[in-house]
Amino acid sequence: MKDVYKRQVIDRPKGTAHPKYPDFIYPVDYGFLRDTASMDGAGIDVWAGSAGDQINAVMCIVDLLKRDSEIKILIGCTEAEISAIYQTHNETAYMKGILIRR
């Protein structure tokens, strides 16, 4: 578990704007796991919360604009952070996600 925590790269800190969609502000630190590959070829995405280094859940996402699906790992997220992440992935008609708790 500690290995996963050490491999996190947070490239979009909480409170920063998305590079392509400046109206979107990240509610929780967001990044990826170094030395991994997801379906889009980039590193596996992570939401890194404020409550430690335990994996809480995963979000399975379908993005109709990008025409892909992804899995995002939630690490150390509080209930409030999990709720904000869930809402983020379900607030538009173009992206939907399901939360799978550990």
Regions found by a protein language model. Give the residues of each.
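Residues in well-ordered beta-strands of folded domains
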Residues: 9-11, 31-33, 47-49, 60-62, ...
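Short, small-residue-biased leader/transition segments that mark boundaries at the very start
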Residues: 4-5
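Helix-rich interaction surfaces within compact, conserved domain-sized segments
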Residues: 57-102
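N-terminal first-folded block
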Residues: 8-33
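Catalytic, metal-anchored helix/loop core of enzyme active sites in primary metabolism
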Residues: 53
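A broad, structure-centric signal for solvent-exposed, well-ordered loop/edge residues
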Residues: 17, 39-40, 68, 82
